[in-house]
Amino acid sequence: MGLCLAKRNHDADDDEPHIELAGGNVHLITTKERWDQKLSEASRDGKIVLANFSARWCGPCKQIAPYYIELSENYPSLMFLVIDVDELSDFSASWEIKATPTFFFLRDGQQVDKLVGANKPELHKKITAILDSLPPSDK
């Protein structure tokens, strides 16, 4: 498992595209309004949200991104979001992000689980456990 400790300053060469963090059915969150919109949409549709607080400069974030995208395609009943902690630093701080990647599982906007670090088996295990806890009509 890997993780990066959160940092407040980023270097000028951090201006890489978001391509490595989002894709597939992963929604890139760039504003608080977009976050609110996606959480509303998920609540309306009865979906669990998996929010990945990530950073472009974080090696483990880059390593798990393709797997996260793959999960988004394999589990369409979940809503997958990615938030760049540098772009939305105040918002990320409100979630007390200490390391990246940090994954939050939310139902109706409330946290139901959390995972810190790029641990593929544990991420998959948590997704499976959450899906198994849902009534059959919500899966």
Curated annotation (Swiss-Prot):
Disulfide bonds join 58-61. Pfam families: Thioredoxin (PF00085). It is found in: Cytoplasm. GO terms for cellular component: cytoplasm. Keywords: Cytoplasm, Disulfide bond, Electron transport, Redox-active center, Transport. Residues 20-132 form the Thioredoxin domain. The active site is at 58 (nucleophile), 61 (nucleophile). Gene3D superfamilies: Glutaredoxin (3.40.30.10). The keyword Transport applies. The record marks 59-60 as: Contributes to redox potential value. Participates in various redox reactions through the reversible oxidation of the active center dithiol to a disulfide. The H form is known to activate a number of cytosolic enzymes. Belongs to the thioredoxin family. Plant H-type subfamily. This is Thioredoxin H-type. It comes from Populus jackii (Balm of Gilead).
